[in-house]
Amino acid sequence: MIQYKEKEIYFIDYSNIKTSEEFLKTIKETGAFREKVKAMGKKDLLILVDITDSYLNIEILDELKKAGRIIKDISMKEAIVGITGYKRILLQIIQTFTNLHFNVFNTTEEAKNWLIKE
């Protein structure tokens, strides 16, 4: 969690991950927190995901779809940065399978400002 202008944002940092193994490990680590939040019945998280300069493949995509299903249950708003090139197509796939609608931003600052806006 990060604090931004007196609001809490659940920041998922997948940036600069260059291997499948490292990405899958990070998804698993962040998954424990998501499960805990879901068990508490929380449904109003502001979520920011950063995948800038990260490597993605089909295996990672499958795990992100699973994570996305939980995020859908615990979030109020979702933002993502680092979406370029083929990642736009992968994001569309994730959104289709999870019914999540991430808003895409160029910078984390833009994303954070959008998340905290009422």
Predicted features along the sequence, with ranges:
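Amphipathic, Lys/Arg-enriched alpha-helical "gate/interface" segment within cytosolic domains
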Residues: 1-118
